[in-house]
């Protein structure tokens, strides 16, 4: 990392009860499972020697719990931003994948298989999510030029951003690598206002 680059570390939250149950989460409340808490603590142990100039998190309970378990001694340093929340899914939130697949197959199919076509009343589409994720991460990167920041957010949020800066299309958003719980991504932001990926879902590039 040169002095002109911002190093951005993006983390997905730990496993939640709704992950286990197979529910659409969005901005509704779900909480970490015991496994999810352990994942966050293990991640925190791996990061213990890395100094972050700023730590940001989505204010959702699952990301808040993840951030607190990663940095238990820095709870007062974590800043929670509404712009980092997961894709808003409207009436799908809290519903089982299996129920939506059976009763609203088009929405299910578009979300998982044709994300560029996904459109549900009261929900964000993936273009809107991509614009939101890119805008806030660019802003936070510019605020810490030459520094290192951490962002705890959500699977679709991070995937939308990574897909965009990797110059891929929205329809490719769910292509591998899969964004596992507590996945660690690293991106560099340079003085020319461009991003480059150095780690994607735990895989170094």
Question: Could you say what each language-model-derived stretch is?
Answer:
Residues 20-23, 106-120:
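Short, basic/glycine-rich phosphate-binding loops at helix/coil junctions
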Residues 169-194:
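Domain-level recognition of soluble alpha/beta enzyme cores
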Residues 155-159, 196:
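GST superfamily/GST-like fold recognition
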Residues 44-109:
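Phosphate-coordination/substrate-recognition cap region in phosphate-metabolizing enzymes
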Residues 8, 147-156:
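Generic beta-sheet signal
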Residues 9, 15-66, 120-134:
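Loop-to-helix element that buttresses phosphate recognition and phosphoryl-transfer chemistry
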Residues 14, 155, 203:
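Active-site metal-binding loops of divalent metal-dependent hydrolases
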Residues 49-51, 140-147:
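Glycine-rich phosphate-binding loop signature in dinucleotide/nucleotide-binding domains
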